[in-house]
Amino acid sequence: MLTSTIDKRIKRLLGISVLLLIIGKGILHLTANLHFDIIFQSGLAFQKVNGIILLILAILPLINSSLLSKKYGLIIFYLASFIIFIKVYVGYANAGFLPEQIVECSIQVGIPITYIHVMRGDLNKRRLIFILQLLVSATFIGHAFYAIGYHIVPSNFLVLTTNSLQIDKGEAINFLYIIGWIDIICAVLIFIPKIRPYIIWYLIIWGFLTAIARTYAFVHESNETAFFINQVFETIYRLPHGLIPLLIWSITRQPTNFQLKNIFKAKPNKMSSEFS
């Protein structure tokens, strides 16, 4: 059976995910035009102020980790989630209020809040697993509805796919349609304990690949250094799309004293009774 306590390795991996998310978002708020003017007057200035706040919120816990166990920790990460949600809502408005735009950002909004409640001891492993599964499932379903073209296939999806795979637009649409349905299936199966160990690696690998594609797709296409740097930070804040499924895997597998080097050992592992 899974132990109820959440150990340091889990907190560390979740903390890394939050840090990547907040830093990536913070830099993009400062360097890119995120179209805040759709919602706010003086939107660009408001956006840059939010970027500065996000970077400060990311740095504070690094300077003084004891902040996380105090009421200030709640303020730090709830504020980070709120600022990120503002950006998500701006994207939602810019996308014509398509529901998948909100849903696909579940990890971005939910992970900072989840992290602080883990640090405060408000969650046990079982609750944490369920919350992480909800966030991963919603994120992949949001991406999937875009990929299958339920309303539209975003132009950036097509550009990323054609540039990364060196295929034409028609082939990219077909590829995205297939992958979209695979995403939906896996987003449902993640809640079935007996099946989860077999599909979690798809979510891990695909989460990392889609993040890396934000940079890789433009390695040979962009002549603008500033644009390419922005794409690097687009990748950085999306790395939790792979890290959070990896965290689910590391919590639910046996043995519980997980180390990365154990992946490469050939010893057979008996599945936890949770999966029986």
Kindly give the residue locations of the regions a language model identified.
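Extended, low-polarity transmembrane helix blocks
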Residues: M1-I152, G170, N174-I178, I192-S276
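Conformational-control "hinges and anchors"
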Residues: A187
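Cytosolic, membrane-interface loops and tails of multi-pass inner-membrane proteins
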Residues: D37-I39, N156-Q166
